[in-house]
Structures are given as C-alpha cells and as structure tokens.
A protein has these predicted regions:
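Enzyme catalytic cores with a strong preference for nitrogen-chemistry domains
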Residues: 32-342
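DNA major-groove recognition helix of helix-turn-helix/homeodomain DNA-binding modules
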Residues: 15-30
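Recognition helix of helix-turn-helix/homeodomain-like DNA-binding domains
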Residues: 1-13
Length: 342
C-alpha cells in the first residue's frame, strides 16, 4: 500500500528515503536474476617456489580478476603461497614466518573483494607443520582446513614433512583471532543459506571416504579442493572422472584447483588441470598446461532440490562445525547453457 501511495503522489518521501527504497528494490531484483546460482572459480598462477611475497602479489591479482568477473567463491591450488615441491624448505622458520605475514596481508585485502576465497599454505601449530587451506571473507579468517591424508607412495613423501589433520576440530589463536582448525568444517553464507561450502586438499579426494563426503552429508553444496596433482600417463582422465563422480554421489558442486607448471622444477610435471563439476556433469575444465582458470555458474538450489529427493538414508558420519559468513553474492549476467531436452 505504501509503495502505491508513493508512486501515485499521495505520499512524499525524502530523497535519501527514496534512494534507500530504490536500492532495496534493485537488490531484490538482482537476487531474483541469479536466484539459486553462484559463480565459482578454480584458479592458479605460475608459482615462484619459496618466493612468498611474489606469490602473494599473484594471489591478489587473481582475486581482483575474479572480482571483476563476479566470482563469489575462489579456490587456489595446494600450498600456493610457497609452492608444493619445497621439500626440506618447509622446515625453515623464515619461510613459515613469511607465510603468516602474507596471510595477515590477505586478511586485510579480503575487505576489498566480494568473495570467499581459499588459499593453500603450510602452517606451524603447536610445533607441528600442517598442509592447510585458509578461508577468507570480508576482512576475517573464517577457518583453517587441514589435509588429512598425506601420500607417501611412489613420487610422494608428504608424510615426511607434514602431520595429518587432528581427529577433532579445535580453536587456535591465529593472527589476532580465534580460528577453527581441522577438516570437519562447513562454511555457511547467512545471506544465502543454500550456499554451504566444504574444503579438502588434494589426496583427501582420492581415498575411500573423503572429507568432502562428510561435509556434504553435513549440508555442504559446494566442495572445494586445493590440489597439486602431478601428471603421468592417463592421470588427467582419471582425475576428471573422480571429480565428476564425487560431485554426482554427493549431489554437490565440486571446484578443483590444480597446481600449474611453476611447480615443475624437480622430477615432477604439473599442468594446472582445473575442473568444476556439478552433480556428475563437468561444467568447465582447463586444458593441460594452458595456465587458464576454470569459472562456472553452479546451481546450489537445484542441488538442494535433488538432495531432498534422494538423501533418504541415515549415514553415521561425524558432525561438522558450522562457520557463518556474510556475503552478498555478485550479480552477473547468466552465461550457462541448459539443454532444452535434458
């Protein structure tokens, strides 16, 4: 009734009140335009091993690029602040201190971009070194996800350096905040409750019961993977299949960010195979060695709809801690194509 009176001229409004009403109606229209969809990105860059400051600059540049494209969830590759193939350099206190300084800078930088993003870094906690993903949004560190499954077969020897994720989450004092530390964490957007995010790291996906399965059963509709997966014959196709399958059986979107060729300085080759899948369908993936990012629109409300149809069973899985954040997802012109006869 009030709106009708305003437009009929029966009621006068102050200019600032009119502007507030206009902005509210515009915001509602934007939400309707992108209802249920979120733009996500699996991104990487040419990493400079042990050069934390240079890698920090490249992370910032990528975030600005994604922000300009309306990407709301940005996933970087495993250990991207230092590089994955660092071997004994991970023990160096100077390197670990540089990482903390870079994370502090990213904490403040996160105020200038409209997204939640995940950055891979080594962290020393209680005297142990962990392979971690740090979540940022709106000037806050939301949580620290820890890699649980550390490969020590064939060309891998991560268990020599890193400790596996503790069995239970706990809080750590980190950069002036109490931050949740573990892998049973789901990040929930309080402004868009269907947008719930789980995180795992590389090898965690390749085991019988990945952390992302536990996170999905605790409500995560978007699962992110920070990876450094090297190339051998036939591995790219297997990687594509495992990402697709994980998204299908958990009715989730899966955002897989893979380390790029900057890691190829030892006896391993990395190609930056970024993949985004939704409910078994590959929405976007990059060509090997292209150095490009994968960006796609995922329909989280569709995923929740599918789960309500098929998730009829009871699973005995651990409970995840829920961390809330406030993010107004970016408005964008939809580009996703749908089959007329699916």
């Amino acid at each position: 009734g009030t709106v009708n009176k305003i437009f009929s001229g029966e009621t006068c409004l102050k200019i600032d009140t009119y502007e507030k009403l206009k902005n509210a109606l515009t915001e509602q229209k934007e939400q309707l335009n992108n209802r249920g969809t979120v733009k996500v990105g699996a991104v990487n860059f040419d990493i400079k091993l042990a050069d934390v400051n240079e890698n920090l600059t490249r992370v910032k540049n990528k975030l600005l690029e994604c922000n300009a494209k309306g990407v709301s969830v940005v996933v970087f590759s495993e250990l991207c602040l230092t590089g994955y193939t660092m071997s004994d350099l991970f023990y160096q206190s100077a390197l670990l201190s540089s990482v903390e300084n870079a994370l502090q800078e990213l904490k403040f930088f996160s105020k200038s971009v409209n997204c939640i993003f995940f950055v891979g870094s080594p962290l020393r906690v209680n005297g142990k070194i962990y392979n971690c993903s740090v979540a940022f949004c709106n000037g806050k560190i939301l949580g620290i996800n820890v890699k649980n499954y550390l490969p020590d077969y064939n060309e891998f020897y991560e268990a020599r350096v890193f400790c596996p994720c503790p069995q239970e989450n706990f809080y750590v004092d980190f950069l002036g905040e109490k931050v949740l530390f573990g892998n049973k964490i789901v990040y929930k957007n309080s402004l868009f409750p269907s947008m719930k995010i789980g995180v795992e790291i590389c090898e965690d996906l390749w085991v019988a019961i990945p952390p992302s399965t536990v996170q999905a059963l605790n409500g995560a509709t978007i699962c992110c993977n920070l990876s450094a997966s090297d190339e051998v014959i036939g591995k790219a196709e297997y990687r594509r299949q495992i990402v697709s399958t994980q998204s299908a059986k958990n009715f989730c979107a899966y955002v897989y960010s893979d380390a790029c060729y900057g890691e190829s300085t030892t006896d391993l080759v990395f190609a930056g195979h970024n993949i985004i899948a939704e409910n078994g369908k590959i929405l976007n993936q990059t060509e090997l060695f292209s150095g490009k990012d994968a960006i796609a629109e995922v329909d989280v409300e569709f995923l929740e709809h599918e789960r309500s149809r098929f998730f009829k069973y009871s699973f005995n899985v651990p409970k995840c801690d829920e961390v809330e954040f406030d993010l107004k997802t970016s408005n964008f012109a939809p580009e996703r194509k749908y089959d007329k006869t699916p």
